[in-house]
Amino acid sequence: MPVLSKLLPTLTLTLPLLAGPCLAAANPKLSKRFTFPIPSSTGSVTFSEPYEIAAGEIYDGELQTFGRGVECTGQDEGGESDTVFIVQEGGTLKNAIIGADQIEGVYCLGACTIENVWWEKVCEDALSLKEGSGPYVVTGGGAQGAEDKVIQHNSEGEVIVDGFTVYDFGKLYRSCGTCGDIQRSATITNVVAVSGSTIAGANGNFGDVVTIDSSNCATDVSAICTTYEADADGGEPEEVSTDVTEACVFEELPACE
């Protein structure tokens, strides 16, 4: 596989910060500057096709930057052939940076662990949970620049997100509202969320439950959790509420320091 020599620098980003509903006031230090804490890359690898992590395999990317050498196509739906990594049942991807030169980042085709994985710039989605019944565990790492979703949960089962950093995003987590009447759940802890629309979206009429406690922090985020009414026939979901509901269980979040 060809190796690219360019290293990925730490990105320093400037943004205005406002307090959203149920959020603490903006931190004055953060209002001056937010630095997305992506690690320095140890090298670059461009795949000509998706790299498959076998069932039960642990793949350590050693903090290299991985991509596909293509331009992002925005919110045009990609497919499995457009991914950087495909993780099979019980597989683990850790210590990797997903570069901006890709369309679909990572697919999990069963329970998976995503540990200390960073997205330089999200394209359509960062992580898509396509098959299986979980659990799907995301620990550490982070993503930025997601026009819409970071984690897309299509399959059934539980998602656990802990210690993730998300900046300049639409939704950190979204339970699929067009994938049929399937119950899904997510627990989100110790997340740093800066400059986004909503941390999570859940389908109340499908029995989804998203839990977000005060171990998380949020600055300039419009909503903590959004409840939708999904359409079992695949129609576009309707936003119902940004308050606490049976589907969205959350506490007031402090501003990020």
Curated annotation (Swiss-Prot):
E.C. code = 4.2.2.2
Q: Which GO terms describe its biological process?
A: cell wall organization; pectin catabolic process
The signal peptide stretch is 1-24
A Pfam match is Pectate_lyase
Any one annotated GO CC term: extracellular region
Catalytic activity reads: Eliminative cleavage of (1->4)-alpha-D-galacturonan to give oligosaccharides with 4-deoxy-alpha-D-galact-4-enuronosyl groups at their non-reducing ends
The protein's required cofactor(s) are namely: Ca(2+)
Cofactor note (record):
Binds 1 Ca(2+) ion per subunit.
Query: Where, per UniProt, does this protein localize?
Result: Secreted
Task: Look up and give the organism this protein is from.
Answer: Emericella nidulans (strain FGSC A4 / ATCC 38163 / CBS 112.46 / NRRL 194 / M139) (Aspergillus nidulans)
Domain of life (superkingdom): Eukaryota
User: Which keywords does the record carry?
Assistant: Calcium, Carbohydrate metabolism, Cell wall biogenesis/degradation, Lyase, Polysaccharide degradation, Secreted, Signal
Where does this protein chiefly localize?
Answer: secreted
Instruction: Give the InterPro entries listed for this entry.
Output: Pectate_lyase_PlyH/PlyE-like (IPR004898), Pectin_lyas_fold (IPR012334), Pectin_lyase_fold/virulence (IPR011050)
Q: Which SUPFAM superfamilies match?
A: Pectin lyase-like
Q: Which family does it belong to?
A: Belongs to the polysaccharide lyase 3 family.
Using the UniProt record, name the top-level EC class of this enzyme in a single word: lyase
Q: Could you tell me one molecular function GO term of this UniProt entry?
A: pectate lyase activity
- What name does the UniProt record give this protein? Probable pectate lyase G
Question: What taxonomic classification does the UniProt entry list for its organism?
Answer: Eukaryota, Fungi, Dikarya, Ascomycota, Pezizomycotina
**What is the primary gene name for this protein?**
plyG
Report the protein's function.
Pectinolytic enzyme consist of four classes of enzymes: pectin lyase, polygalacturonase, pectin methylesterase and rhamnogalacturonase. Among pectinolytic enzymes, pectin lyase is the most important in depolymerization of pectin, since it cleaves internal glycosidic bonds of highly methylated pectins. Favors pectate, the anion, over pectin, the methyl ester.
